[in-house]
């Protein structure tokens, strides 16, 4: 028996040398988008009886995919540790690791309707996890020498911006609204500081084709920000919410114009980078609709977001059936 275990470990070691782990960390964008869309549908429960069923189905699928990916990442930590280490120290790819605590919090948000205790545990794990990761990894960049202008990619929004906004929303769900404001402030200031740096980089140099799908992350900050804000202020659509929504739509128009350039080399799973922004657009649209504010725009935003994420799902299924989903 030990002989077979030794052979298996040697085989795994050989595989590590010859091929990458089949699941990139960026693929956590799939349960991210599905979970956020589930929450958007949940907020329509009092308007459409079927909305709860749609939300539950999306939530169950998102949670199942998240569990699968977490197990695969645990396997990666065990047998592909050098690849994990390289990703952590990469000036670009390290940001995608933040998707793990972000999705953990969103799955906690979904589970809250069924099991508040487990949900709260997941939300706190995600909140503490993202804060520790940002503290350890992002602070290293302040030491200099490890970050260059070309390292400025949209994925850099994830650790300090998206993660803090998600913490704000999740903590508000648990009733910690004041604490949520702290994370909201952290995310908003981080966004304001990083946004001009990224836009300046995009103006003076082009993203490589393999990184262009990450442009979808640019859609997220404004819509995730307004969703977090509406969570902690009890859903009141005030002037700030309208301002944030307006900026989100401006980014949407820019990205629609750039989309042919983004997919110049073909469709790929990386396009799920758009999903968090799209789902947060739908989520905030429900609050605008409930508040009788820009109801026509909110209906369009909700329908558009669902159609776009539906197309991402169809693309993913196609890639799976063609054997093009996992890295080889």
UniProtKB/Swiss-Prot annotation:
Instruction: Return the similarity comment.
Output: Belongs to the tellurite-resistance/dicarboxylate transporter (TDT) family.
Assembly and oligomerization: Homotrimer. Each subunit forms a channel.
GO molecular-function annotation terms?
identical protein binding; monoatomic cation efflux transmembrane transporter activity
- Per the UniProt topology annotation, the Periplasmic ranges are 43-49, 113-115, 175-176, 233-238, 290-294
**Ranges that cross the membrane:** 22-42, 50-73, 94-112, 116-141, 154-174, 177-204, 209-232, 239-262, 269-289, 295-321
Q: Where is the signal peptide, in residue numbers?
A: none
At the top level, the lineage of the source is Bacteria
InterPro entries according to UniProt: SLAC1/Mae1/Ssu1/TehA, TehA, TehA/Mae1, Tellurite_res_ion_channel, Voltage-dep_anion_channel_sf
Any idea what job this protein has? Ion channel involved in potassium tellurite resistance.
- Keyword check for Transmembrane helix: yes
Please state the protein's primary subcellular location.
membrane
Give the recorded effect for residue 276 to T.
Small constitutive ion flux
The annotated topology with respect to the bilayer is: Multi-pass membrane protein
UniProt-listed Gene3D superfamilies: Voltage-dependent anion channel
Record protein name field: Tellurite resistance protein TehA homolog
Effect ascribed to mutating residue 276 to A/G: Constitutively open channel. Abolishes ion flux
Q: Metal-binding among the record's keywords?
A: no
Q: Where in the cell is it found?
A: Cell inner membrane
One Gene Ontology BP term is: response to tellurium ion
CC terms in the record's Gene Ontology section:
plasma membrane
Alphabetical keyword list: Antibiotic resistance, Cell inner membrane, Cell membrane, Ion channel, Ion transport, Membrane, Tellurium resistance, Transmembrane, Transmembrane helix, Transport
Hey, which stretches end up on the Cytoplasmic side? 1-21, 74-93, 142-153, 205-208, 263-268, 322-328
């Amino acid at each position: 028996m030990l002989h077979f275990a030794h052979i298996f470990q040697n085989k795994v070691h050989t595989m590590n040398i010859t091929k990458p782990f089949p699941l990139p960390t960026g693929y956590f964008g799939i349960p991210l988008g599905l979970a956020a869309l589930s929450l958007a549908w949940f907020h329509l429960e009092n308007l459409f009886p079927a909305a709860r069923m749609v939300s539950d189905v999306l939530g169950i699928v998102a949670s199942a995919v998240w569990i699968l990916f977490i197990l695969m990442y645990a396997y990666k930590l065990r047998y592909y540790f050098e690849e994990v280490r390289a990703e952590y120290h990469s000036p670009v790819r390290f940001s995608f690791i933040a998707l793990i605590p972000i999705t953990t919090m969103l799955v906690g948000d979904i589970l809250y309707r069924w099991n508040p205790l487990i949900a709260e545990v997941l939300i706190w794990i995600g909140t503490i996890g993202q804060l520790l990761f940002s503290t350890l990894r992002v602070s290293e960049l302040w030491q200099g020498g490890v970050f260059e202008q070309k390292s400025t990619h949209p994925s850099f929004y994830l650790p300090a911006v998206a993660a803090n906004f998600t913490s704000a929303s999740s903590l508000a769900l648990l009733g910690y609204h004041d604490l949520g404001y702290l994370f909201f402030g952290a995310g908003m200031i981080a966004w304001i500081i990083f946004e001009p740096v990224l836009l300046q980089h995009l103006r003076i140099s082009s993203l490589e084709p393999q990184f262009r799908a990450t442009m979808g992350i640019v859609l997220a900050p404004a819509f995730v920000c307004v969703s977090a804000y509406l969570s902690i202020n009890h859903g009141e659509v005030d002037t700030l919410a309208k301002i944030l929504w307006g900026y989100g739509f401006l980014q949407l128009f820019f990205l629609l114009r750039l989309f042919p350039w983004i997919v110049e080399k073909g469709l790929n799973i990386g396009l799920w980078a758009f999903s968090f922004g799209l789902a947060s657009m739908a989520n905030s649209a429900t609050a605008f609709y409930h508040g009788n504010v820009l109801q026509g725009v909110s209906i369009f935003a909700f329908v558009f977001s669902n159609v776009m994420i539906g197309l991402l799902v169809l693309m993913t299924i196609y890639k799976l059936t063609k054997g093009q989903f996992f890295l080889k």
